[in-house]
């Protein structure tokens, strides 16, 4: 049986610590915008998909893009809808699905929040450089947002 790694050399523990530090920085930066981290991710994903795909995204497409659970995505989108940041409507293709789009105020907030988060990311990942950070993270967790949109 081999000896376990010292904590300073444990990749899992190091990743855990880095993730917590990054999440704390993001959470603090989003607080003045009255957004939680998950609300930001889903609002920004909705905005990005609306801007970059030919049809309004469904809740399922947003969940797939963000890598979030479908049920949790639905709950968070409902909360964003209650705040007037997104509109959810029956999907014209699939009556079971809901299409989502940001409202004008949701789009403004998404743009502002993305700029805030990108600034945090720039500073946070500066010690290793953005390209190296993206290369490593892409190898560890392939970008699911590049998957093709689902029909549902």
Task: State what each model feature region is.
Residues 3, 46-47, 96-97:
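Short secondary-structure capping/turn micro-motifs that flank functional sites
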Residues 7-25, 45, 69, 105, ...:
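C-terminal ligand-sensing/allosteric alpha-helical core of TetR-family HTH transcriptional regulators
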Residues 1-7, 53, 57, 131-152:
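C-terminal regulatory/oligomerization modules of transcriptional regulators
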Residues 51, 78-138:
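Charged, amphipathic alpha-helical coiled-coil/dimerization segments
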Residues 1-33, 131, 152:
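N-terminal leader segment of winged-helix/HTH proteins
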Residues 20, 24-69:
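N-terminal helix-turn-helix DNA-binding core of bacterial DNA-binding proteins
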